[in-house]
Design a protein with these regions (language model features):
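Glycine-rich, highly charged phosphate/nucleotide-binding loops
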Residues: 9-15, 80-92
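Non-catalytic C-terminal accessory region of glycerolipid acyltransferases
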Residues: 88-221
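Short amphipathic alpha-helical face segments that pack within enzyme cores
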Residues: 5, 39-42, 122-126
Length: 221
């Protein structure tokens, strides 16, 4: 997946304080918008490859793409409640075995156009996850893909604080996620941390300065 990201993006950026303030011994449910094909890859790169936390994602089409199992994909077919229940239990066991593990969760349920924006999400979804995994903290992570003056897409991350639903309302997850996503879309600030340098642009690879004497002679007087 690292190779796939490197060939698909000009760079992957983090906006905001780095490294993020995450608890070492609490499971995370990473709540992210799902606007781009590579969102799952990007979250894996951030949480597992960069921050070193084991990760999982519930995947509706796992039967079609079981090759993602080694990187934490678990089957979650919409028409098979028994398999979904097994995945829920397997996730709980992973959280117990690895207290720093992260579950990627897309509240929209499906891939959506960025034009749709963030939400509204049914807060009962977050409340249900909290009942299943009461020790887990919810971490709203916004993803945005832009060209940003580059010849290839640039992926950007920005995150809110970790939320404990024992103390905060489930609706706070959507509020923080929307706020961070809007900041990413409107930001003109440089990233605080470069997570990956991917495809180089032609301007970075090529220089024709050696032809300067020739073309100078072709300029009009």
């Amino acid at each position: 997946m690292r190779w796939d990201l490197r060939r698909s993006f000009q760079r992957i950026e983090w906006h905001g304080p780095w490294p993020p303030a995450l608890p070492e011994a609490r499971p995370l449910i990473v709540c992210a918008n799902h606007h781009h094909f590579y969102d799952g890859h990007l979250l894996w790169y951030l949480l597992t490859d960069t921050l070193g936390r084991p990760s999982m994602v519930w995947m509706q089409e796992w039967n079609r793409f079981p090759l993602f199992a080694p990187v934490g994909a678990l089957p979650f077919p919409p028409d098979d409640p028994q398999t979904r229940a097994t995945t829920v239990r397997r996730t709980a066991r992973q959280f117990q075995a690895h207290p720093d593990a992260a579950l990627f969760y897309f509240p929209s349920g499906t891939l959506q156009s960025p034009n749709v924006g963030i939400g509204p999400y049914a807060v009962e979804r977050f409340a249900r996850l909290h009942r299943l995994y009461p020790d887990a903290l919810f971490w709203p992570v916004a993803l945005h893909v832009t060209w940003d003056g580059a010849p290839h897409p640039v992926a950007q991350f920005q995150a809110g604080p970790c939320l404990d639903l024992e103390r905060q309302a489930p609706g706070a997850i959507e509020t923080h996620l929307r706020r961070q996503w809007r900041r990413l879309r409107e930001t003109t600030a440089a990233p605080t941390h470069l997570l990956m340098r991917g495809r180089t642009s032609p301007a970075d690879r090529w220089s024709f300065a050696w032809t300067l004497p020739l073309f100078k002679r072709l300029l009009p007087p």
